[in-house]
Amino acid sequence: MVDFCLNQVQAKEKMMKIIKGRKENWEKEAEKVCHDFDMFCEYLLEKKVKLSKGSGNIGKKACFELNSFFTVKEDFEKPTRLQKDYPVINFFYFFAVSKGILEQDPKGNYMQPGCNYRCYKEAEVLERFLLLLMDVLFDGRFSNDSAWSGLSMEYLMNWAEKKRPCANKSYALPENISVRLCMTGRDNLMTYLEELGVLTLRLKEGQKYLLPIERQWKMEIKPLFELVCNLYSTVHKEYDEEKEDLAFFCFD
C-alpha cells in the first residue's frame, strides 16, 4: 500500500466538492455498506462478545456468525476459522479500533464504545463511507496481502482510466488481477471492494467447475466505483482545482 501522506482534511474537502453533484445516488449505495459495519459494531457491543486474551481478536464462533450478516461472505461450513481468515471482519475490526469507534474495556475482555463512537454515528452516511474507503485504498495494515492489494489497486485504476467503464455494466477482470485470482483463489482487495459496494465479481458462464487456474472472471461496475476513482485520483495525482469533473464514467 502507498503511504497515505495527503492531509485527510484536504482530501475530504476535495471529495465533498466532487460528491455534491451526485450525492443522492451515491448515498443510497453507501448506506448499504455502512449498514454492514453498523451491524458489526452492534453485534460486538450488544452481545458482549468475548475477545481473545492473547490477541484481543474476535473468537471463532462469533466470527462465523458475523460472517453470515455481510454482503460478502466466506464459504465456511463450521466455526473453526480465526478472525484473520475473514477479510471483511478483519477490516471492520481494524477500522473500528484504529478510528476510535470501538475500544477494548479496561480488562481487555469485550469491546465498548470508543471516544469517536458518537461522532461516527452522527456523521452523514457519505462521510462514514469515505472513512471506510480511505482505509481500504491507502492503509492496508489489516490485510494479509497489503503489498498485493496496493498493486491490484494500481492495476485497477490504470485499467479504469484507459477503459472508461460505465456503471452497471460488466467487464473482463484486468489481466494482472485475474492471474492472481486464478493462481491463489483470492485477491483481498477485490473482497474489500465488493463489500464496499464498488464492484461485483462473477465467474463467466460455465466456468464454475473448471480448475481455478482455468477460470475467467468478470466484474460488474457499481455507481460507487466512480467515487473510488475520484478519491484515488485526488490523493495520487496532481488535481486541478478548476476541473471539478474527474469522472471516467458514463451514466445513462
Predicted features and spans:
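Short, amphipathic alpha-helical interface elements at domain boundaries
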Residues: 1-91, 117
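Short N-terminal secondary-structure initiator segments
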Residues: 2-9, 92-111
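Interaction-mediating elements
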Residues: 15-18, 29, 161, 173, ...
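Short alpha-helical segments that sit at the start of domains
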Residues: 24-60, 121-165
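Short acidic, hydrophobic short linear motifs in intrinsically disordered regions
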Residues: 47-80, 147-181, 205-206
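Short amphipathic alpha-helical interaction segments
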Residues: 82-98, 179-204
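Accessory beta->alpha helical hairpin/"wing" motif in late/C-terminal subdomains of nucleic-acid enzymes
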Residues: 103-144, 200-251
